């Protein structure tokens, strides 16, 4: 029946005498807020994984012990790091090594990292294997990684990703050391008259070389495919690796092509990894392999004649005959220090490289002779707009 005024007043008084009711209501609201916050955080993590996932593509064959070191170092990163998926491309390991690789893949998968093992027997072709991995990748970025790379620092990938996401950046590389040392293996590729080389290779990283070349992030003509990060859309826009370059210079050719498309290639120098160089395919020093190397280098320059002996990121006043970066004055060489701009040279018919970026310079480096010596340097302004803007 209907409640009378007395009963209503009594219930109201009982509620007022129960102070825990207010706290219970507040606790339920707080619990709901926590649940909503957790759900929102999970949705944000899923979105982050979808938007920024890096697909790590690793070509490998008959190398499970070294591969294991690579995979474990890759997955030992702190919580909250850029998420990865791994695509392992095997072009024909023997049965014993295939089983070892499958066990390794299961270990990595059980530990929580998505990994896919693609076993497709074929002759070794680095470009084909990388392109195959890129076809299967779901990530917004692609990291091409040799199976003999050992990662050493927690935030190396996050740092590389932050650079690769910049709209004008093509590929991003990492400083590489020889195992258990600070001896440089890769610090960006330089294109010299003898061909593409790793400047500062075999040199100790215990000092700063020319203007901090081994200390700061640098633009370069290309980075090594042993550890190369690139946005998926840019890689596909470029058309992937050229499969006619089966072993060597495929990474350099990609770097040349990215420059021609208007992108920069960058080497990140404040993080490093170890490179147990070429353990998968062996040495390149046999006569047959040296012949192949020469042939692929010539093919590279047939594809990009304007780059033969030219590197827009390497000063002409530095050594162009070896791996060090010492200054070589113009009077000791036959070079012309007043050559026309790089993008106007080398193309048939005299056409310019229209898409190469011609940004204003950020720094003017001027070296002068001291009173005790004459070095014979020439100062060439390369960006009059920038220099005039700072005259005052």
Per-range role (PLM):
Residues 1-52, 293-298, 306-367:
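Non-catalytic membrane-proximal stalk/linker segments that position and tether the catalytic domains
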Residues 156-160, 219-239, 244-272:
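A short, conserved alpha-helix in the catalytic core of glycosyltransferases
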Residues 127-128, 193-230:
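A recurrent flexible, glycine/aromatic-enriched loop bordering the glycosyltransferase active site
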Residues 385-392:
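Conserved small/polar residues in nucleotide/adenosyl-binding loops
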């Amino acid at each position: 029946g209907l409640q009378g005024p007395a009963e209503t007043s009594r219930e109201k008084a009982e509620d007022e005498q129960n102070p825990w009711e207010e706290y219970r209501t507040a606790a339920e609201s707080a619990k709901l807020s926590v649940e909503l916050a957790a759900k929102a955080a999970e949705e944000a993590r899923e979105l982050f994984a979808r938007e920024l996932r890096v697909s790590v593509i690793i070509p490998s064959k008959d190398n499970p012990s070294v591969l294991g070191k690579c995979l474990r170092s890759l997955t030992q990163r702190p919580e909250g790091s850029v998420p990865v998926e791994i695509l392992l491309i095997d072009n024909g390991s023997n049965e014993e090594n295939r089983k070892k690789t499958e066990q390794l893949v299961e270990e990595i998968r059980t530990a929580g990292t998505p990994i896919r093992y693609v076993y497709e027997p074929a002759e070794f072709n680095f470009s084909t294997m990388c392109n195959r991995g890129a076809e299967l990748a779901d990530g917004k970025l692609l990291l091409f990684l040799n199976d003999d790379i050992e990662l050493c620092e927690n935030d190396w990938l996050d740092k590389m990703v932050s650079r690769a996401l910049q709209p004008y950046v093509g590929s991003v590389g990492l400083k590489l050391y020889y195992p258990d040392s600070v001896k440089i293996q890769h610090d960006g590729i330089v294109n010299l008259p003898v061909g593409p080389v790793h400047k500062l290779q075999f040199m100790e990283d215990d000092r700063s070389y020319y203007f901090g070349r081994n200390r700061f992030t640098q633009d370069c003509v290309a980075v090594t495919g042993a550890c190369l990060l690139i946005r998926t859309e840019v890689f596909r826009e470029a058309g992937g690796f050229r499969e006619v370059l089966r072993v060597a210079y495929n990474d350099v050719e990609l770097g040349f092509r990215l420059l021609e498309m208007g992108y920069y290639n960058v080497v990140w120098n404040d993080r490093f990894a170890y490179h147990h160089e070429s353990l998968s395919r062996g040495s390149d020093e046999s006569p047959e392999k040296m012949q192949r190397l020469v042939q692929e280098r010539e093919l590279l320059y047939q594809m990009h004649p304007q780059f033969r002996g030219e590197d827009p990121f390497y000063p002409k006043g530095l050594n162009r005959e070896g791996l060090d970066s010492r200054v070589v004055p113009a009077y000791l060489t036959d070079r012309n220090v007043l050559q026309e701009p790089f993008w106007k040279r080398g193309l048939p018919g005299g056409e310019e490289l229209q898409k190469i970026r011609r940004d204003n310079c950020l720094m003017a480096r001027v070296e002068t002779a001291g009173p005790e010596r004459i070095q014979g340097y020439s100062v060439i302004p390369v960006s009059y707009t920038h220099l005039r803007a700072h005259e005052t």
